[in-house]
Amino acid sequence: MNFLLTLAYDGTNYCGFQVQPNGRSVAAVFQDALEAVLGARPDIKGCSRTDAGVHALGFRLNFHADTRIPPEKLPLALNQHLPPDIRVLAARVVPEDFHARYAAHTKTYLYRIHNHPIDSPFDAAYYTRIPKHLDEVRMQAAAQQFVGTHDFLALCAAGSSAAAHGDTVRTITDCHVTRRGDEIDIEVTADGYLYNMVRILAGTLC
């Protein structure tokens, strides 16, 4: 059977989602849990490859496995073998040819800014602090310039394989800025991203 799972994870202690030769990845830790529950270590296909330190609220992945465990029981079974910073939220069976990466037509990133001189002691790991006052109205107007299909080479960090191969055209379908008190959220939806693209985009708007 082909299982589709939804995960949430705190990426602080990981080198990213994808398995890396030198580093602790979300995928490797998740596969350890799969092996503990299923007695096998199936290949997993993630919807994206988040970078080091990036968190996920609704990350989709799929894998094929022969098991009698019903999908509704998988979240509890896997969560018992996962660290507290990775959680399976839901699981279901999908068609055999389903592939999480190819089925993900858009991906949404949320970049949070704490617009205050002093950090919050409770969630400082989940935002970037900018002490100077930011004008969210002007930021929202500027954000609209990114919407559409463009060559985003200028928003790509050095060392990107996509940039090396000239594959830097992406389509942003939505980019908006909202403020709630001292918190500013920059939310971007696109068909794909370059290395550190959202971080650089957020820095440009600020």
Features from the language model and the residues they span:
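Structured-RNA-binding interfaces characteristic of tRNA pseudouridine synthases
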Residues: M1-C206
